[in-house]
Amino acid sequence: MDSQRNLLVIALLFVSFMIWQAWEQDKNPQPQQQQTTQTTTTAAGSAADQGVPASGQGKQITVKTDVLELTINTRGGDIEQALLLTYPKELKSNEPFQLLETTPEFLYQAQSGLTGRDGPDNPANGARPLYNVDKDTFVMADGQNELAIPMTYTDAAGNTFTKTFTLKRGEYAVSVGYNVQNTSAKPLEVSTFGQLKQSINLPSHRDTGSSNFALHTFRGAAYSTPDTKYEKYKFDTIADNENLNVSAKGGWVAMLQQYFATAWVPNNDGVNNFYTANLGNGIAAIGYKSQPVLVQPGQTGTLGSTLWVGPEIQNKMAAVAPHLDLTVDYGWLWFISQPLFKLLKWIHSFLGNWGFSIIVITFIVRGIMYPLTKAQYTSMAKMRMLQPKIAAMRERLGDDKQRQSQEMMALYKAEKVNPLGGCFPLLIQMPIFLALYYMLMGSVELRHAPFALWIHDLSAQDPYYILPILMGITMFFIQKMSPTTVTDPMQQKIMTFMPVIFTVFFLWFPSGLVLYYIVSNLVTILQQQLIYRGLEKRGLHSREKKKS
């Protein structure tokens, strides 16, 4: 196998990857218009079937820090809107990115409360407590590092339930704590629950294009337990009523999209029930319910959970809960993508530019893979040296395919040539290619990250298509500089158009990924020349002009 055939192998692998990606892509089902009933698992029913009351039953309060602006409804204390103040909705926009939303077009909320036998959140009738709060707006002042929002509710028996949201400067983890003051004569049995619910179908203003041909990032639910570190749960699976019902200690539940996530993390060491539910009307939910806690008469019980609502910043998410950083969609090669990102981030700490960091990591990766590249070219050179003998053998044996195969294998063995030697190193490199693909596409740090000149966003396609064209040119040079023994006219035509085909593919790829391939191709050209010089000294390569 020579370099020209390798290009064909790369193309086939690339197309296969894109077909597989399209097959695996989360295709959101269209909800039936007549569907209005809620469907839950038995274990999930305690929290999942609690609907949102009419807006007039509660009031909205605003909570603002340096990075978050939350809108909380005093009916139940649900977070109905979340703005990420340091992340613009679009490049060069003053409008912040909205993660949670409650509008007629789209619903995405973070719900929480106290359920159980004596909890104020009653699953039987969907009742939610109406909390009292002393003001409508809470703003973190300059120099203030923590902001607490206490909300109180007193039931008919005189028991007081205090729900407190605590936010810290620069943080996307929101602490939700509960104090249960039992003034009755009997023990109170309560459990915490946290639920995320979202419209399955995206309206146009929420569609980020994360499901186009060039890019597939997961949008849906996920959960983690000690036995299952990280498991995705598709919205269409929930829509089909194939619901999750798992009980385990610790863990978390989340809803994911490109670059951003929400997650409920129970603050207890007891057993939690994790569930998903189809709430009807095209709304999916994932949540947890903790095991009951008894608060004795005259005592105050303390419970709580943590909500992550923000960008997928891996080190901060890992500090909130084990394996929460796995929500960054690095695909099935996350174990390669994660260390690559850590290396990229370390390089960025010195250079301060993600584009130049991509260039440096490309040199590092290609340097590490150089022995494989050298082995690949050496094997291809040996195969080319055998072509005259193989041609003579085929002419001598005619149509006897069995003898051709036997004598060819004997020839390979005698000459110590592995016929797959040119392909095997290429196959080893494919996981690195895919891992880099996912790393560059799933890291929020590269969202709206500028490079230089006309590239203002490495996560978006080149607006002028200059980088894809440059990539095609470098691929053309690699093709022209590579010796070939291909004689089949069809293969020759395919290889001639290969740079054009790849250029078209890459027109819609994010510029950060295209930049990686340009630099990788340039490094390939340099390595190719270096390897050819060594092969010339061994008599395995000549500088004769390549046949067209």
Curated annotation (Swiss-Prot):
The compartments listed are:
Cell inner membrane
- An annotated GO BP: protein transport
Q: Per its UniProt entry, which superkingdom is the organism in?
A: Bacteria
- Indicate whether Heme appears among the record's keywords: no
Query: Compositional bias (Low complexity) at which positions?
Result: 29-42
Molecular function GO terms recorded? membrane insertase activity
Family matches, as InterPro entries: Membr_insert_YidC, Membr_insert_YidC_N, YidC/ALB3/OXA1/COX18, YidC/Oxa/ALB_C, YidC_ALB_C, YidC_periplasmic_sf
Q: Which CDD domains match?
A: 5TM_YidC_Alb3, EcYidC-like_peri
Membrane topology annotation = Multi-pass membrane protein
Which keywords annotate this record? Answer: Cell inner membrane, Cell membrane, Chaperone, Membrane, Protein transport, Transmembrane, Transmembrane helix, Transport
Example of a GO cellular component annotation carried by this entry: plasma membrane
Q: Does the keyword Transmembrane helix apply?
A: yes
Residue span of region Disordered: 28-58
Transmembrane segment boundaries: 6-26, 350-370, 420-440, 458-478, 499-519
**Pfam families, from UniProt?**
60KD_IMP (PF02096), YidC_periplas (PF14849)
First and last residue of the signal peptide: none
- Function description: Required for the insertion and/or proper folding and/or complex formation of integral membrane proteins into the membrane. Involved in integration of membrane proteins that insert both dependently and independently of the Sec translocase complex, as well as at least some lipoproteins. Aids folding of multispanning membrane proteins.
Q: Which PANTHER family match?
A: CYTOCHROME C OXIDASE ASSEMBLY PROTEIN COX18, MITOCHONDRIAL, OXA1
What does the record note on quaternary structure? Interacts with the Sec translocase complex via SecD. Specifically interacts with transmembrane segments of nascent integral membrane proteins during membrane integration.
Q: Can you tell me which family this protein belongs to?
A: Belongs to the OXA1/ALB3/YidC family. Type 1 subfamily.
The protein depicted here goes by the name Membrane protein insertase YidC
Gene symbol here is yidC
